[in-house]
UniProtKB/Swiss-Prot annotation:
TGBp1, TGBp2 and TGBp3 seem to act together for cell-to-cell propagation. TGBp1 is the main movement protein that physically cross the plasmodesma with the viral genome. TGBp2 and TGBp3 would facilitate TGBp1 function. Belongs to the Tymovirales TGBp3 protein family. Plays a role in viral cell-to-cell propagation, by facilitating genome transport to neighboring plant cells through plasmosdesmata. May induce the formation of granular vesicles derived from the Endoplasmic reticulum, which align on actin filaments. The chain crosses the membrane at residues 3-23. This is Movement protein TGBp3. Its main location: host cell. Residues 1-2 are lumenal. It is found in: Host endoplasmic reticulum membrane. Residues 24-66 are cytoplasmic. One of its GO terms (biological process) is transport of virus in host, cell to cell.
Amino acid sequence: MDFTTLIIIGVYLLVFIVYFAKINTSVCTISISGASIEISGCDNPTLFEILPKLRPFNHGLSLPSN
């Protein structure tokens, strides 16, 4: 990965976290290790409906459009 890719992923994760903060009132623990992202402590089922749509590596870092 080059530096530009890391910046894009960083910005994506920032938007990702802010996006969840708006739709989820419970506290989420997001831990990133390697290429896997583990999210725990969320009781909102909306999280699990949206999560598959937000996988950056499956969609070429494209943000979801509502």
